[in-house]
C-alpha cells in the first residue's frame, strides 16, 4: 500500500495512486501482480482508471499529445508551439470535449466536428471552444483566418467529420494535424 492513514467513518476509503510502483517493486512483474490483485491500475492521462472527471482531466494530456505530434510530424522545435498550424478532429463529448481547448493552449487553429448540437452547446457555454457554426464555409473561414494570423482558435462545427474533411480537400486546405 501507498500508506496507512488514520481516518473516521466519513473519510474516503480509497486513496488513488494509480500505477505508482516504487523502489524494489517498480517493475512490470510487480505492477501486473498488483493490478491482478485490484490494488493498482494503469491511470493513463486522467485522474485515474477508477473515476471519470470529464475534459478537465484530459486537457493537459491532449495538449501534450498535440504539441508532441507537431514536433514529431511537423518538425516544430521544442521552444515553439502550433501557431500557424491547422488541427482537425471530431468529438466534443465527455473526454473528447478537451480537444478544442487543448489546441488553443497549444497555439493551433482548430476545427472540431460534432454531430450532437447539445455537446457543442455545453462546450461553447463552458468555454472549451471559442466559436460555433453549422456552416462548413464559416468554420473553414474562421479557422483559416486565425491560422494565417498565427492566432489560436477552437471552432466547433456541427456536422460530420467526413463532410468537413471532404470540404477541406475540395477547397485545397492543408491540414497539419
Task: State where each predicted segment sits.
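Glycine/serine-rich phosphate-binding loop and adjoining beta1-alpha1 elements at the start
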Residues: 1-83
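Short alpha-helical segments and helix-capping/turn motifs at coil-helix boundaries
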Residues: 1-2, 95-98, 139, 162-168
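Generic structural signal of hydrophobic/aromatic residues within well-ordered alpha-helices
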Residues: 10-12, 16, 62, 120, ...
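Non-transmembrane, aqueous-exposed alpha-helical and coiled segments at domain scale
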Residues: 70-82, 152, 159-175
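Active-site proximal loops enriched in glycine and acidic residues that flank catalytic Cys/His/Asp
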Residues: 114-115, 157-159
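Sequence-level detector for tyrosine residue identity
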Residues: 42, 52, 124, 157, ...
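Catalytic or ion-translocation cores adjacent to nucleophile or general acid/base/metal-coordination motifs
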Residues: 44-50, 54-64, 83-86, 92-152, ...
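A general structural signal for short secondary-structure junctions and capping/turn motifs
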Residues: 4-8, 79, 101-103, 145-148, ...
Amino acid at each position: 500500500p501507498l500508506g496507512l492513514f488514520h481516518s473516521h467513518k466519513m473519510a474516503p476509503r480509497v486513496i488513488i495512486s494509480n500505477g505508482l510502483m516504487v523502489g524494489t517493486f517498480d517493475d512490470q512483474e510487480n505492477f501486473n501482480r498488483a493490478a491482478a490483485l485490484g490494488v493498482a491500475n494503469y491511470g493513463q492521462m486522467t485522474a485515474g482508471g477508477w473515476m471519470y472527471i470529464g475534459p478537465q482531466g484530459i486537457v493537459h494530456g491532449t495538449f501534450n499529445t498535440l504539441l508532441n505530434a507537431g514536433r514529431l510530424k511537423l518538425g516544430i522545435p521544442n521552444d515553439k508551439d502550433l501557431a500557424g498550424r491547422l488541427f482537425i478532429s471530431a468529438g466534443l463529448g465527455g473526454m473528447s470535449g478537451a480537444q478544442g481547448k487543448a489546441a488553443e493552449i497549444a497555439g493551433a487553429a482548430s476545427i472540431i466536428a460534432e454531430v450532437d448540437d447539445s455537446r457543442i452547446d455545453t462546450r461553447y457555454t463552458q468555454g472549451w471552444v471559442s466559436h460555433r457554426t453549422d456552416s462548413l464555409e464559416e468554420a473553414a473561414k474562421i479557422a483559416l483566418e486565425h491560422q494565417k494570423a498565427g492566432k489560436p482558435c477552437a471552432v466547433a462545427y456541427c456536422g460530420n467529420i467526413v463532410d468537413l474533411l471532404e470540404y477541406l480537400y475540395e477547397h485545397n486546405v492543408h491540414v497539419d494535424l
